[in-house]
Amino acid sequence: MIEIKNLHAEVNGTPILKGINLEIYPGEVHAIMGPNGSGKSTLAKIIAGHPDYTVTKGEIFYDVNFKKINILDLEPEERAREGIFMAFQYPVEIPGVNTSVFLRAAFNEICKHQGAEEMDPMDFDDYLRSKMKLLSMDDKFLNRPVNVDFSGGEKKRNEILQMAVLNPHFSVLDETDSGLDIDSMRIVADGVNKLKNKNNATLLITHYQRLLNYIIPDYVHILRNGKIIKTEGKELALQVEEKGYDWL
């Protein structure tokens, strides 16, 4: 589904990623851990197409709908239409834009790209409410501006609601556990787990092992100084929790 080959990237002329190689297949959950400044969020933002980061070498191939494309050739909105989703560490507030209207516009944009009919407001309302139940979200969210005056937990749940509504092929969750109490983390993790199937894949970016108690990864990768230095199963996260990163 996603193949990252020899990816090098910089910001403001400073090298951040120094040769990332990673393959993620449908049905898999991968987690990337690493100390602060190792390049974890940089990798997430490059996959999403953030303009502040410059790729100096490498490719990111993405298989979808029987075609293989280098997403580095696509604008951020084109990547989203092709089924790539990113949940931000710090979700953006959009004053004046109703959450349900925002989600319906995004959903119908993907429908249009796929050649499907757009969903009318009444049908979309039913669809949206069914997804909200996955995250124990109150109907009051529907009429609130996107992320405005939301608590940290509400913002993260709203990000996963977007993931549920848009049904992406490949999702990147950038430190989704950041700022969450244990109850909110369980709700968010439960929503992510319910969305997992054999046709999609997820990349978790996290600093701590605790999220991986609730979303079990198939593989854990340790990123340090811009390179993946070790890959194993979930037990690697437990070792990092116990020993830190210096032993690697």
PLM features: what roles do these ranges have?
Residues E59-R79, N147:
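ABC ATPase NBD Q-loop/coupling interface
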Residues I2-I4, L17-G19:
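Conserved structural motif at the start of ABC-family nucleotide-binding domains
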Residues V172-T176, D183:
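Walker B catalytic motif
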Residues E77, E82, Q89-H169:
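ABC-family P-loop ATPase nucleotide-binding domains
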Residues Y219, L223, K227-L248:
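Conserved beta-strand-loop-alpha-helix hinge in the C-terminal portion
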Residues I24-P26:
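Conserved hydrophobic segment flanking the Walker A/P-loop of ABC-type ATPase nucleotide-binding domains
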Residues M33-P35:
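The feature captures the beta-strand-to-loop junction immediately N-terminal to the Walker
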